[in-house]
Amino acid sequence: MESFFNNTFATLIAYIGIIFTYLLVIPLLLFYWMNNRWNIMGKFERLGIYGLVFLFFPGLILFSPFLNLRLKGSGKG
């Protein structure tokens, strides 16, 4: 079991998992959360979301050309 933890392959897999989570999974969850709750968030929830946006900014930048958070208007004009 000790040789598994000293293995370079296991370390590489761990890094890939962390990077995948940091750059892809959590930013997509943040986009989904903000898109669904933007108009009904409380002040502490909004403060927490702003903190998470600051923390996961690199991943959000990766998705920003493809996703947007434009509010849906009345459709007139």
UniProtKB/Swiss-Prot annotation:
One of its GO terms (cellular component) is plasma membrane-derived thylakoid membrane. The keyword Ubl conjugation does not apply. It is found in: Cellular thylakoid membrane. GO terms for molecular function: oxidoreductase activity, acting on NAD(P)H, quinone or similar compound as acceptor; quinone binding. It is a multi-pass membrane protein. It holds the Pfam family NdhL. Its EC number is 7.1.1.-. It catalyses: a plastoquinone + NADH + (n+1) H(+)(in) = a plastoquinol + NAD(+) + n H(+)(out); a plastoquinone + NADPH + (n+1) H(+)(in) = a plastoquinol + NADP(+) + n H(+)(out). InterPro entries: NADH-quinone_OxRdatse_su_L. The chain crosses the membrane at residues 12-32, 47-67. NDH-1 can be composed of about 15 different subunits; different subcomplexes with different compositions have been identified which probably have different functions. Belongs to the complex I NdhL subunit family. HAMAP family: NDH1_NDH1L (MF_01355). This is NAD(P)H-quinone oxidoreductase subunit L.
